[in-house]
Amino acid sequence: MRVADSIMKKSIGLVGDTGRMGVLLTQALLCRPHCFLGKGFSRRSQTSLEEVVTENDILIDFSSPEVTSLLLDFLLKTPRPVIIGTTGFTNDSGVKTKLSALSEYVPVVVCANTSLGAYVQKRLAAFAAKLFSTSYDVRILETHHRAKADAISGTAISLAEAIRSAKAESYEEEPEPFIEMHGSRLGNVCGEHEVSFVGEDERFVIRHEVFSRRVFSGGVLLILEKIMGEGLPKGYYTSDVLYESLFQEKVFG
């Protein structure tokens, strides 16, 4: 039996349903046979966040840090599986604490970037970080559309964390590497990330460029299918963790 055939139809609530990602996800979900669009929320909608939580089976959030924080307050009262695609949280916002608390009851998937290419780039960057000595300088450049609020992007921060972790594992005695990071907001660029390892005699570059936001909605649908089809246990997940299981199946399965 195919996964899709074994899934009971679920109601999906989109938070941020009139935004760039919300519109794409609305179009994509309308074509999925095993789920249907329930009530959604945007700043202009007449539906309350509480209604969206109580009247849907699964929530997908691409809104703003402020709205996400309020959404989590309602989810802690009425737990539902949730995919969080919003970025730009500050350390003192309390969102991380709320996510951790919610994950005690339901699966919580936090994804700064749902593109498979972004996951592969991070894997390659971590691998390269282990090979290139600390004498190599590291730089991350990211570019997004002018309306994106957070800079540096969540994806760039995640890349830096992966590189630092890999360096710490391979060069324990060396100080934590300095990673130069730059962000640009230009036009309607969907997303570009470039990681450079620069030595005295060479430069190694890993670049990922997104041409269409459809790649992000496709990644969200993969995550959604994993939640619905495999009965993902309660816990805190990232898109990397779920892609890692897919990677293991493709390469070693």
Swiss-Prot record:
Keywords: Amino-acid biosynthesis, Cytoplasm, Diaminopimelate biosynthesis, Lysine biosynthesis, NAD, NADP, Oxidoreductase. GO terms for biological process: diaminopimelate biosynthetic process; lysine biosynthetic process via diaminopimelate. One of its GO terms (molecular function) is oxidoreductase activity, acting on CH or CH2 groups, NAD or NADP as acceptor. The active site is at residues 144, 148. Catalyzes the conversion of 4-hydroxy-tetrahydrodipicolinate (HTPA) to tetrahydrodipicolinate. It is found in: Cytoplasm. This is 4-hydroxy-tetrahydrodipicolinate reductase. The keyword Amino-acid biosynthesis applies. It holds the Pfam family DapB_C. (S)-2,3,4,5-tetrahydrodipicolinate binds at residues 145, 154-155. It comes from Chlamydia trachomatis serovar A (strain ATCC VR-571B / DSM 19440 / HAR-13). NAD(+) binds at residues 16-21, 85-87, 111-114. Its EC number is 1.17.1.8. It catalyses: (S)-2,3,4,5-tetrahydrodipicolinate + NAD(+) + H2O = (2S,4S)-4-hydroxy-2,3,4,5-tetrahydrodipicolinate + NADH + H(+); (S)-2,3,4,5-tetrahydrodipicolinate + NADP(+) + H2O = (2S,4S)-4-hydroxy-2,3,4,5-tetrahydrodipicolinate + NADPH + H(+). Transmembrane segments: none annotated. Pathway: Amino-acid biosynthesis; L-lysine biosynthesis via DAP pathway; (S)-tetrahydrodipicolinate from L-aspartate: step 4/4. CDD domains: DHDPR_N. InterPro entries: DapB_C, DapB_N, DapB_N_CS, DHDPR_bac, NAD(P)-bd_dom_sf. The gene is dapB. GO terms for cellular component: cytosol. NADP(+) binds at residue 44. The lineage of its organism: Bacteria, Pseudomonadati, Chlamydiota, Chlamydiia, Chlamydiales. Belongs to the DapB family.
